[in-house]
UniProtKB/Swiss-Prot annotation:
InterPro entries: Haem_Oase-like_multi-hlx, PqqC, PqqC-like, Thiaminase-2/PQQC. This is Pyrroloquinoline-quinone synthase. One of its GO terms (molecular function) is pyrroloquinoline-quinone synthase activity. It catalyses: 6-(2-amino-2-carboxyethyl)-7,8-dioxo-1,2,3,4,7,8-hexahydroquinoline-2,4-dicarboxylate + 3 O2 = pyrroloquinoline quinone + 2 H2O2 + 2 H2O + H(+). Pathway: Cofactor biosynthesis; pyrroloquinoline quinone biosynthesis. Ring cyclization and eight-electron oxidation of 3a-(2-amino-2-carboxyethyl)-4,5-dioxo-4,5,6,7,8,9-hexahydroquinoline-7,9-dicarboxylic-acid to PQQ. GO terms for biological process: pyrroloquinoline quinone biosynthetic process; sulfur compound metabolic process. Its EC number is 1.3.3.11. CDD domains: TenA_PqqC. Keywords: Oxidoreductase, PQQ biosynthesis.
Length: 251
C-alpha cells in the first residue's frame, strides 16, 4: 500500500472538500425532506432533535476557545458563540431555531425541555462536544469544517421547503437565511487554520479523519431519526410506545 504524501495547500483543500460526498445532505432522510416526501412528524422530529445540536454549538466553541492560547484566534472565534447565543443586535441562532420549531407546530417549551431528543442524537452530539474539549484546539476548530458544505444545504431548504411544506410558517426560515453568510465567513477562517496547521503528512491525514468523524456524527443523527420517524422503530419500540429513554442532564 502506497504511503500518503505531503499535499500542497491546494491539494489538501481539495481533499477536504472531497469529503463533501459524505455530507448528510445525501442521507435518505434529508433527500426525503428536500423532495417534499417527509411527513409533518418527520419534519418536527428533525427540528426537535437538531435543536439539541444547535444548543451545543456554543458549548463546543467555548471549549475550543478555552484551549486556545492565541488571542487573535479567540477574537474571531467568539463571533460563532454570539451568532448562536445572540447579542445586542441579534437574537441569535438558537432563538431563530426556536422560531423554526414554532413554525412547524412545536411548542418552544417542549423544545427547551429536550424531551423529544433521541438517545442516538444525544450521544452523537455529546461526542462532538467531548472531542472539542479534549482535542488540541486546532483539531477541534477544524472539526467544524463541515461548514464547507453547509451553504448548499441551507439554500436547498430555502428553495424547496416553502414549495413542499406550505404549512410551515414563513417566520421559521430566518435561521437558514442567517446562516448563509455566517457559514461562508466561518468556512474562510476555519480553512485558513486547517491549511496553516496541517503542514505534515500526519497532520493532514489526521485532519481528514477528524472531518470524517464530524460527518459520521451528522449522518448518525439522521440514522437515529430514520429509525424513530421513518421506520417507526424508536428506542424500546418492541416493548413500549412511550418515550422511556433518559432525558439527559445526568452530570
Amino acid at each position: 500500500m502506497t504511503e500518503p504524501a505531503l499535499m500542497t495547500p491546494q491539494q489538501f483543500e481539495q481533499a477536504l472538500r472531497a469529503r463533501g460526498a459524505y455530507y448528510h445532505i445525501y442521507h435518505p432522510y434529508h433527500i426525503a425532506m428536500h423532495n417534499g416526501e417527509a411527513t409533518r412528524e418527520q419534519i418536527q422530529g428533525w427540528v426537535a432533535n437538531r435543536f439539541y445540536y444547535q444548543t451545543r454549538i456554543p458549548l463546543k466553541d467555548a471549549a475550543i476557545m478555552a484551549n486556545c492560547p492565541d488571542a487573535a484566534t479567540r477574537r474571531k472565534w467568539v463571533q460563532r458563540i454570539l451568532d448562536h447565543d445572540g447579542h445586542d443586535d441579534s437574537d441569535g441562532g438558537i432563538e431563530a431555531w426556536l422560531r423554526l420549531g414554532e413554525a412547524v407546530g412545536l411548542d418552544r417549551e417542549v423544545l427547551l425541555s429536550e424531551q423529544l431528543v433521541l438517545p442516538g442524537v444525544r450521544f452523537a452530539v455529546d461526542a462532538y462536544v467531548s472531542f472539542a474539549r479534549r482535542a488540541v484546539w486546532q483539531e477541534a476548530a477544524c472539526s467544524s469544517l463541515t461548514e464547507l458544505f453547509a451553504p448548499e444545504i441551507h439554500q436547498s431548504r430555502l428553495d424547496s421547503w416553502p414549495q413542499h411544506y406550505p404549512w410551515i410558517e414563513e417566520e421559521g426560515y430566518g435561521y437558514f437565511r442567517g446562516r448563509l453568510g455566517q457559514a461562508r465567513r466561518d468556512v474562510e477562517h476555519g480553512l485558513q487554520l486547517a491549511l496553516a496547521y496541517c503542514n505534515s503528512v500526519e497532520k493532514q491525514q489526521r485532519m481528514l479523519e477528524i472531518l470524517q468523524f464530524k460527518l459520521d456524527i451528522l449522518w448518525s443523527m439522521l440514522d437515529a431519526m430514520t429509525m424513530a420517524y421513518t421506520l417507526n422503530r424508536a428506542p424500546y419500540h418492541t416493548v413500549t410506545d412511550q418515550p422511556v429513554w433518559h432525558q439527559g442532564k445526568l452530570l
